A protein has these predicted regions:
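Alpha-helical scaffold segments
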Residues: 1-117
Length: 117
């Protein structure tokens, strides 16, 4: 039985993702933010994107690192912080801040996730 393996990440892949991240359309930038092979520096740059959809895509990216999630835990938009609250890679210090979040839904989502772990 063969197993599926993801193709190797090439310089070409990274260049295409960088081009997508600069696209004027937020949906295209969000697709770059959600990509599993997007390099960390690209993801961190997208954390500054003005469009909430892009930052939500970052917070939902299964391969997002703890440092990026810690940064997104301070996002001005509550829906981004809610996605950070449910991400399994969110570090403890970010969870502690989210537990004191001004938005009751962020706190509720975090409490629900924490109680189920």
């Amino acid at each position: 039985m063969s197993t599926f393996r993801s193709p190797e990440v090439t310089g070409s892949t990274v260049r295409r993702l960088a081009a997508l991240a600069r696209d004027p359309r937020p949906g295209i930038r969000a697709s770059a933010a959600a990509h599993r092979h997007a390099p960390a520096e690209l993801l961190h740059a997208l954390a500054e994107d003005e469009d909430t959809r892009v930052r939500v895509a970052l917070a939902r990216n299964a391969w997002a690192g703890p440092d990026l999630l810690d940064r997104l835990a301070g996002d001005a938009v509550a829906v981004v912080r809610r996605w950070v609250a449910v991400h399994p890679n969110t570090p403890a210090q970010a969870r502690d801040r989210l537990a004191q979040d001004e938005d009751p839904q962020v706190r509720a989502v975090l409490a629900m996730v924490t109680s189920s772990r």
